[in-house]
Amino acid sequence: SSRRNLELVETMREKQKKGSLLWVLDKTKTAMGARMLRSYIEQPLINKDDIIKRQDCIQELSDSLIDREELREYLNPVYDIERIMTKISCKTANPRDLIAFRNTLEMLPHIKRIIGNFHSEEFAACYDKLDDLADLYELINSAIVEEPPISVRDGGIIKEGYSKEADELRDAKIKGKEWLSELEIREKERTGIKTLKVKYNKVFGYYLEVTNSFKDKVPPEWVRKQTLTNAERYTTDELKHLEDVILGAEDKLYSLEYDLFSEVRERIASQVVRIQGTAKAVAMIDAYASLSVVATQNNYVRPKINDKGVIDIKNGRHPVVEKMISNDMFIANDTYLDNNSNRVAIITGPN
């Protein structure tokens, strides 16, 4: 109830992010960072040392604007690692998910390099946790084509050179297509059927299509497969043989590519602990960078934390109210509270 009334992550009436504290503070670049920042707001630190450690990180980022902005540039294309790992673990990740994951892994060495420039305790620990996962990057980069299909069953997934067997089947498939092209040209010349086309569908396989105007030129050895309104479809012994070669190679290739893709996915899944550690580190970096950006843009100051029971605020500004109205209209206020005479009592009851 208190969280809802404080409108920390959404407004009470509209249930919208705009108008909440999260709306003001969220300048994150990644989905993971956004979730981490939300958890910071919903579960604030209460230990003085932990608060100071977090402040140290935000201070370092604010004092190093060039590093911070470069860091945010590398965070921007980072995919939701936590989400994709769920898909990988559940074996629902498709080839495009792995390419998106690879593109994210490409950013990690740059992020780690920049974090190495900072010296606060939290960033030092973060640097150690952030594994650049270079082996997984190389695995995906060597195995999966640059622009794969979504489906894992229709081939076109595995890169040339990754599997000798897949390369051999791919060559057989390509040569088969060349043979079909040669057959079409040869039969056109032999029969004089200018509109002759070698076509394919999943029901009838490969066939020779002849428009009705050329039906009288069809050789007697051709076997009719289907009659259409404007054309006839035929097959020959040679075409049947080529179909067996091509479809046999295709079926084997698609099956092999699926197995190879599944193997790559399983190898990534086996590294879940490393990946989760890196995801958490990236999320923390993004959340801290967001808080630093907000602090810089709004000229926030770093509060001094004390355990003396004193709250002393000079020119305090409500972060949400200030953003909801014109800055010229907002009036800053001082606040002083302590455990002695300067106290506020909130009396509550059923009425």
Range-by-range predicted roles:
Residues 1-350:
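Alpha-helical coupling/stalk and coiled-coil linker elements that connect catalytic or binding modules
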